[in-house]
Curated annotation (Swiss-Prot):
Keyword Oxidoreductase: yes
Enzyme Commission number(s): 1.1.98.2
Keywords: Carbohydrate metabolism, Oxidoreductase
Active site residues of this protein: 40 (proton donor), 109 (proton acceptor)
Record family assignment: Belongs to the F420-dependent glucose-6-phosphate dehydrogenase family.
Class of this enzyme: oxidoreductase
Protein name (record): F420-dependent glucose-6-phosphate dehydrogenase
GO molecular function, one term: oxidoreductase activity, acting on paired donors, with incorporation or reduction of molecular oxygen
Annotated positions binding coenzyme F420-(gamma-Glu)n: 39, 76, 107-108, 112, 177-178, 180-181
Organism, as annotated: Mycobacterium avium (strain 104)
Subunit and interaction comment: Homodimer.
Amino acid sequence: MAELKLGYKASAEQFAPRELVELAVAAEAHGMDSATVSDHFQPWRHEGGHAPFSLAWMTAVGERTTRITLGTSVLTPTFRYNPAVVAQAFATMACLYPGRIFLGVGTGEALNEIATGYQGEWPEFKERFARLRESVRLMRELWRGDRVDFDGEYYRLKGASIYDVPDGGVPIYIAAGGPAVAKYAGRAGDGFICTSGKGEELYKDKLIPAVKEGAAINDRNVDDIDKMIEIKISYDPDPELALENTRFWAPLSLTAEQKHSIDDPIEMEKAADALPIEQVAKRWIVASDPDEAVAKVKDYVDWGLNHLVFHAPGHDQRRFLELFEKDLAPRLRRLG
């Protein structure tokens, strides 16, 4: 079985840059193994929202910490970024913080790409997935080679070199919400990323089997693939606070279909705030008893996920980190 790891999701949509750095530093002090950050150009909310640049954040946190692994969860290397520049940025960070950097990638959302100049109708999944696969191939060729020529359907290189690259390149974690991309993660990813709260059958019957199937295609040991899940958890001994803390993150409770074509944080906020608190809370483990919280998290471990990254919704993140270290971490470590 793969090693059990506990991580912290730094909520870039909720906190300003300096505070977000300090929270990651605190996460290491409270015993977390990793800290991940989303890469949004625009947040889910216009009022009270934030969107610091993920790569600047990673570098700042890297300088302030010594142990935790840092990565994006996730970045889209296909539209507003050129994947060659992403490859250069992550190679540099991996040289600065050896063994501590990974690149988490996904197929992208209209919210972040249309505002930065994408022209035309937002592409359907088939094209976005094709772009992702091509960008991963391109980045790995740059990390392996010298004077690289690449002639893809979407991206091209001519005599390109990255001059500072760690041995072995940079681990790539592939985010998936369905079996097609999960299978690709098993075949081509160093890690796999998914998010919690979407029903047992998705993880147990679709995502994890697809990762295993993809690994088998390339004769890989699935235990060598870091299987990460962002666990949405609102834990507090005060049950009313545990419930109310979820409200800021109401946009996560919108369906993929509802979010697909929304490219404006004001419209996203409006759609999300129309949801009742009970619907918002369904995406979260809302608990005031530590044993109850850990029992719900254990399901994900039993289904085959080993890297548990905890996303807490409340504004008092230091309170969450203290409660996590005291109440949840000792119980969770025993699961491994």
